[in-house]
């Protein structure tokens, strides 16, 4: 029986799933929006939205909890200094999943874009490689 077992397994082991969502969360916080499969995008909300709620608390314990998920001091700083203040006064729903019309070529997986509902300034780390090209 599947009582109280929420979340999709995505055909991965628990450690692989945890690493996948950590990496997707890092990419979303860095770039502001990412393209992935629809199911991964919907499950990613369960990781990212609590992180933004932590950023709204903005205390030392919240920073340490965010670091335990992200593992990067630069991303934690960006989360608390840039992304969090953009959502002050918003009671939830920090991300938006937009379904794309074309499925992924090869396996026909439905694709989606996950992005923040409020505009967050692009980080210098994400902008630097774009300028170098």
UniProtKB/Swiss-Prot annotation:
One of its GO terms (biological process) is translation. One of its GO terms (molecular function) is structural constituent of ribosome. It comes from the Bacteria. Gene3D superfamilies: Ribosomal protein L17. InterPro entries: Ribosomal_bL17, Ribosomal_bL17_sf. The keyword Ribosomal protein applies. Keywords: Ribonucleoprotein, Ribosomal protein. The keyword Ribosomal protein applies. GO terms for cellular component: cytosolic large ribosomal subunit. Belongs to the bacterial ribosomal protein bL17 family. Part of the 50S ribosomal subunit. Contacts protein L32. This is Large ribosomal subunit protein bL17. It comes from Nitratidesulfovibrio vulgaris (strain ATCC 29579 / DSM 644 / CCUG 34227 / NCIMB 8303 / VKM B-1760 / Hildenborough) (Desulfovibrio vulgaris). The lineage of its organism: Bacteria, Pseudomonadati, Thermodesulfobacteriota, Desulfovibrionia, Desulfovibrionales.
């Amino acid at each position: 029986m599947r009582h109280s077992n929420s979340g999709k397994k995505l055909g991965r082991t628990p450690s692989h799933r945890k690493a996948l969502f950590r990496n997707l969360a890092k990419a979303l916080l860095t770039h502001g929006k990412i393209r992935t499969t629809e199911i991964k995008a919907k499950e990613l909300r369960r990781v990212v939205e609590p992180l933004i709620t932590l950023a709204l608390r903005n205390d030392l314990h919240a920073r340490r909890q965010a670091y335990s998920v992200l593992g990067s001091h630069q991303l934690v700083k960006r989360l608390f200094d840039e992304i969090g203040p953009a959502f002050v006064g918003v009671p939830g729903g920090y991300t938006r999943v937009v379904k794309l019309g074309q499925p992924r070529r090869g396996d026909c997986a439905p694709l989606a874009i996950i992005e923040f509902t409020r505009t967050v300034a692009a980080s210098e780390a994400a902008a630097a490689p774009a300028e170098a090209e």
